From Swiss-Prot:
Protein name: Glycosyl hydrolase family 109 protein
Domain of life: Bacteria
Stretches assigned to coiled coil: none
Organism, as annotated: Streptomyces filamentosus
EC number(s) reported in the record: 3.2.1.-
Transmembrane segments: none
Record note on cofactor: Binds 1 NAD(+) per subunit. The NAD(+) cannot dissociate.
A Pfam family of this chain: GFO_IDH_MocA
Positions with a binding annotation for NAD(+): N104, R105, D126, W175, E176, L177, H178, E195, C196, N224, Y284
């Protein structure tokens, strides 16, 4: 045990290691209907009903019906606990980690946890035992004791979450499993970090917010793009006023994934492709939305209030299948409804506009757009370029490299970080583990996770209703009006 860590507050109402917690899991319909296997994911029949009662019934109705359904879910239910905004972690000398999911992403991310001092990987879990054993060998190769392995069945992750020697659970599994796994981790007294998106239904987002507040456990969307070098530089410049009063921004996940989604070996089964048979909207808003929301202090002085979405005809995946997949391939049984490109306009309480795009099924170069504009100028990424008054007055883009002095301290401290995605993965894991060790407030919280993910179900509804604006819930229940720190941290004393 960590002898210098204060005992973690137990979840209110439901002791984390009691039979009551198990009973809650057994009663959760999402836990019953979704199996953590390729066959379970494919056969679970997660169509529109997976979005919740409001979404399923409104999907094919009129715009007024869609608005009514969204408003019903947007209304904040009574608070069950206390806000988690600004709540620090408990200080500890060592962060003990359990990892659920060791496919492509999990297998690479475990290396980053093992590279950090003061971090121990205590348990690993995957339904494919070979993957769990491979991860366990990495742990011992790093000089740590052999971790416990959980690979018995699709429910074995529950036993990992029940362990008394884990502080933080990292969830790296198919999207439909993120919600039940995050929920189980918090019910068992663990802080939890989840890959994108954190859930697929508005009702699930509210449940995670409420459970985080009630259990006093942090539930975070581990959004690595918030830690990109350019993103963190723009953040500091924006908060220093170089862009003037912020007016607009844009973010995207435009990434041609057709080959990977039809590759039988890259993903563990067709789970990612199958979401294009279920939803029409933006399936992956977080990479683009998170950084722009940070620039604008969303949940920390401003909030997003509505979203309006449109989408193109779904042609890309079917065309790729026609050209590349043999007759008899299981994919020929699939009917794709997901728009090749979705475009959403998000309005904030202060009148700012955020444009979100999503396109993984047509040919194009990679781009997250990552733009920000204000009364003094604008930045756009892919390629990076900037135009700021009074320096720029000739209507020509300027070199963003000139602004290196505004790099975040994390990038000055770790100039050439290891790991994937240009080093942002390492920066994210380093900072999260630092916050947990030193007892700091996390850079983002459950409210950010919920806001960044809300476009998943809402964009689908809006597209079905011909682009009608829909309300985005205030997951903070009014706490957004209070100015507080976020990603723009200063280097802490160790």
């Amino acid at each position: 045990m960590n002898d210098d860590a204060r005992p973690a507050p137990e979840p209110q109402d439901i002791p984390p290691h009691s039979g009551a917690a198990d009973e809650v899991n057994r009663q959760d319909p999402s836990r019953r209907s979704v199996l953590w296997t390729t066959a379970g994911v494919a056969g679970a029949g997660l169509g529109l009903g997976a979005l919740g009662a409001g979404t399923a019934s409104a999907a094919g109705r009129s715009a007024p019906d869609a608005v009514a359904a969204a408003e019903a879910v947007a209304a904040a239910p009574p608070r069950q606990g206390r806000t988690m905004a600004g709540v620090p972690f408990e200080r500890r000398s060592t962060v003990r980690v359990g990892i659920i999911g060791l496919g492509n992403r999990g297998d690479s991310m475990i290396d980053l946890f093992l590279a950090l001092p003061g971090v121990q990987v205590k348990a690993v879990c995957d339904t494919v035992r070979d993957k769990a054993e491979k991860a366990a060998k990495k742990v011992t190769a790093a000089g740590q004791p052999a971790p416990a392995i959980y690979a018995k069945d699709e429910h074995d992750y529950e036993n990992l979450c029940k362990r008394g020697d884990i502080d933080f659970v990292y969830v790296v599994t198919p999207w439909e499993l993120h919600f039940p796994m995050a929920k189980t981790a918090m019910l068992n007294g663990k802080h939890v970090g989840v890959e994108c998106p954190i859930a697929m239904r508005l009702e699930e987002l509210w449940q995670l917010v409420d459970l985080s507040e009630r259990t006093r456990r942090h539930c975070m969307q581990l959004e690595n793009c918030c830690y990109g070098k350019n993103e963190m530089r723009v953040l500091r410049m924006a908060h220093a006023g170089l862009f003037g009063e912020l007016q607009h921004g844009a973010g995207a996940y435009n990434h041609d994934l057709r080959e990977l989604m039809f590759d039988p070996d890259y993903y563990e089964g067709p789970w990612r492709r199958l979401w294009h048979t279920r939803l029409r909207g933006d399936l992956y808003p977080n990479h683009g939305f998170g950084p722009v929301a940070n620039y604008m202090d969303v949940n920390r002085g401003d909030r997003v209030v509505s979203i309006s979405s449109v989408g193109t005809t779904p042609l890309g995946l079917a065309a790729y299948r026609e050209e590349h997949m043999p007759a008899g391939d299981p994919s020929w049984k699939e009917s794709y409804i997901g728009a090749d490109r979705t475009i959403s306009l998000v309005q904030t309480a202060k009148g700012r506009v955020i444009r979100l795009e999503h396109d993984v099924s047509s040919p194009h170069p990679y781009s997250r757009i990552n733009s920000l504009g204000g009364t003094k100028g604008v930045f756009e990424d892919y390629p990076e370029r900037i135009y700021l008054e009074p320096t720029n007055t000739n209507h020509q883009w300027d070199d963003f490299k000139k602004y290196a002095e505004w790099d975040h301290w994390l990038w000055k401290e770790h100039a050439n970080p290891p790991g994937g995605h240009g080093g942002m993965d390492y920066i994210m894991v380093f900072r999260l583990m630092q916050c947990m060790r030193l007892g700091l407030v996390p850079d983002f919280d459950v409210y950010d996770a919920a806001v960044w993910t809300a476009p998943v179900p809402l964009s689908h509804l809006s597209i079905k209703a011909k682009g009608v604006p829909l309300p985005i819930p205030d997951f903070t229940r009014g706490e957004w009006k209070k100015t507080r720190s976020g990603m723009d941290s200063e280097k802490p004393a160790e």
